[in-house]
C-alpha cells in the first residue's frame, strides 16, 4: 500500500488487550520494533464521553502498536434491510478515521499517505486524564500511554494542520 501512496486504516481489535504484549495481525512492525510502513494507521475505540471510562472497554490499545483513538462505541449505523442500529467496535472507529483521511486527501491531494498519517496523529486532542484500559478497573493508565500519539483524532484540527502542510 505504501508504494502506491495508500493509507491503510486498521481497526485495533476488540479483545481489550495491550497489543504491545500480544501479537495481533495485521500490524506495521515486527516484535514491537520500528515501523515497516509509514502508511499503516491502527485505531482504537472511544466511548461517547470524557473521563476515566472514555476508552471503550473492548478496545485493544498499545503505546507502540495503536496510533490513535476515535469514537467507536454507541455509533448509530446502517444495518442490513435498510435498518439502523447502535454498534460498537474498533471497526466503527477505523471508518471514522478513514473518513477524516479521505476529507484531507480530497482537499489537499498533494499530501502523501504518510503525511496524512502524520497529520492525523499530530493534530488530535490529547486527554490529560487516567483511563481504564481493556475494561479492567484495576488497569488504570494515563490516556497517553495507550496509544503512540497519545491523541484522539480531531477532524477540524487535522484540516488546519493539513492546510499548513500543503503550502
Language-model region placement:
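Short, function-defining helix-loop hinge/capping sites that tune catalysis or transport
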Residues: 21, 97-99, 146, 162
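Extracellular S/T/G-rich loop segment that most often corresponds to the catalytic His/Ser-adjacent loop
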Residues: 4-6, 24-106, 110, 151-157
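Active-site environment of divalent metal-dependent phosphoester hydrolases
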Residues: 15-20
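Short Gly/charged-rich anion-binding patches and loops
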Residues: 21, 63, 115
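C-terminal subdomain of the subtilisin-like protease fold in secreted/lumenal serine endopeptidases
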Residues: 4, 38-42, 106-167
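A short beta-strand-to-loop transition that corresponds to the Sensor-1 phosphate-sensing loop
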Residues: 12-14, 46
Amino acid at each position: 500500500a505504501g508504494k502506491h501512496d495508500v493509507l491503510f486504516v486498521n481497526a485495533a481489535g476488540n479483545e481489550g488487550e495491550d497489543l504491545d504484549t500480544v501479537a495481533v495481525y495485521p500490524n506495521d512492525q515486527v516484535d514491537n520494533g520500528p515501523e515497516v510502513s509509514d502508511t499503516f494507521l491502527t485505531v482504537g475505540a472511544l466511548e461517547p464521553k470524557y473521563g476515566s471510562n472514555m476508552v471503550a472497554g473492548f478496545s485493544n490499545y498499545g503505546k507502540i502498536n495503536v496510533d490513535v483513538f476515535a469514537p467507536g462505541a454507541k455509533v448509530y449505523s446502517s444495518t442490513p434491510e435498510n435498518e439502523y442500529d447502535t454498534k460498537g467496535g474498533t471497526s466503527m472507529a477505523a471508518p471514522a478515521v478513514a473518513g477524516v483521511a479521505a476529507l484531507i486527501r480530497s482537499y489537499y491531494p498533494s499530501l502523501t499517505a504518510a503525511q496524512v498519517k502524520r497529520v492525523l496523529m499530530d493534530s488530535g486532542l490529547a486527554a490529560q486524564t487516567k483511563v481504564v484500559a481493556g475494561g479492567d478497573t484495576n488497569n488504570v493508565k494515563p490516556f497517553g500511554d495507550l496509544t503512540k500519539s497519545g491523541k484522539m483524532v480531531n477532524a477540524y484540527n487535522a484540516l488546519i494542520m493539513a492546510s499548513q502542510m500543503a503550502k
